[in-house]
Amino acid sequence: MIEHASKADRKNDRPVKRRPRRSAEETRRDILAKAEELFRERGFNAVAIADIAAALSMSPANIFKNFSSKNALVDALGFEQIGVFERQICPLDKSHPPLERLRHLAHNLMEQHHQDLNKNPYVFEMILMTAKQDMKCGDYYKTVIVKLLAEIIEDGVEAGTYAATDALSLGETVLHALTSVIHPVLIAREDIGNLATRCDQLVDLIDAGLRNPLAK
C-alpha cells in the first residue's frame, strides 16, 4: 500500500521550472532600471545597494559583481542619460547663422537641465552627493558639449563670421562661460524666465567675443 502511494506521488511530480538564465547585459540593465526607479521614489541618499538587491530578489554581491560601488552605478546611469541627450539634442546645422546655433544649443541645455531637476529631484541630490567624485560620465558629457560648441565655432570661422582660432579650446571656454545658466546646481532654484534672459545675454557676449577677439 505504501509502495503504491509512493509510485502515485512520483507520477504526479512535476519538474521544477527555473527562471531562464539572464545574460550579463540583461542583469546590468535590470539593476540600472531598478536603481533609477528607487532613486526617483525615495531619493538618492536613502537608497543603498542592499535595497536595490532586495527589490530585484538578488544578493548585494550580484550588484557588486556588475558595479563596484554606488558611485559606479551612478556613473553608468549618467552615461545612459547622456545617450538619451545625444539622441534628443538636435543641434541646428550650418545653414543657420552661428549666433542662432549658439542660442539654440544654450537654451536647449538650460531648459533640459531645468526640466530634469523639476521632474526628477533625485538627479539634483545625486549630483550634489557625487560632486567631489571622479565621475567618468561627467567628463564625457563635457566632451560632448565642447564638441558641439567647437563645430559651431569652426563653421563660423569657415563662413568668415568668427576670427580664426583653436575651436576645441575655445569651445571649452564657451562652456565655462555658459555654466551659470546650464549647471544643475546653479540653476536649481532659478526662475526659467530669468534664466532665459541671462542665457540670451551671455550668448550675445560670447558671439561678440568670437567675432572680435582680444589682441594678444
Annotate each language-model stretch with its function.
Residues 1-18, 104, 111, 115, ...:
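C-terminal peripheral helix-coil segments that are non-catalytic and often amphipathic
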Residues 1-42, 47-55, 72-75:
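Basic, helix-initiating cap at the start of DNA-binding domains
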Residues 18-22, 26, 68, 72, ...:
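Residues at secondary-structure transition points
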Residues 26, 30-37, 41, 55, ...:
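Alpha-helical structural segments
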Residues 56-67:
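Short hydrophobic/aromatic patch on the recognition helix
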Residues 101, 113-135, 183-186:
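Amphipathic alpha-helical segments used for helix-helix packing
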Residues 163, 167-171:
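Membrane-interface starts of transmembrane alpha-helices
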